[in-house]
Amino acid sequence: MAKVSLEKDKIKFLLVEGVHQKALESLRAAGYTNIEFHKGALDDEQLKESIRDAHFIGLRSRTHLTEDVINAAEKLVAIGCFCIGTNQVDLDAAAKRGIPVFNAPFSNTRSVAELVIGELLLLLRGVPEANAKAHRGVWNKLAAGSFEARGKKWVSSATVIWYAIGHSG
């Protein structure tokens, strides 16, 4: 059978910005050992040096893969964005080189939905206003004007607008 790939120890992965340890563990479990891992983002010069012989790069949103950086990557095969977007990658430059760019579009939709629901409850219960008053030394123990979401018919007591765009919508 013909050899269709480099040996696993010859394939270099560059992981920056503290990509989750599960990615590192998965690569190692699959037999890849040539992994360069950085907890933070690299400046342009460091990035150009590290990416020069990398086959794959995994990044989050702080690292910007400009056309100059992509052109410095002599062996780059794919770019993995461990986040929702790809706006940190010059997609045209990657396309010119035939380098696919992947992302994780649903990676935090549950977190965003939970945050929105939590903030909605905070607003409905008047927590920001009560917090501001408490910081000014005012503690209002009266229940007048308070609101609980449970068991309420919101149409009569409040107007709730749920407007969302993107994958969380």
Residue ranges with predicted function:
Residues M1-F102:
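An N-terminal-biased, well-structured beta-alpha scaffold segment characteristic
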Residues R97-S156, I165:
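Phosphate-binding beta-alpha-beta segment of Rossmann-like dinucleotide-binding domains, i.e.
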Residues H20, V160-I165:
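N-terminal Rossmann-fold NAD(P) dinucleotide-binding loop
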Residues H167-G169:
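Aromatic pocket-lining residues of Rossmann-like dinucleotide-binding sites
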Residues L15-V16, W154-A158:
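Conserved N-terminal Rossmann-fold NAD(P)-binding element of oxidoreductases
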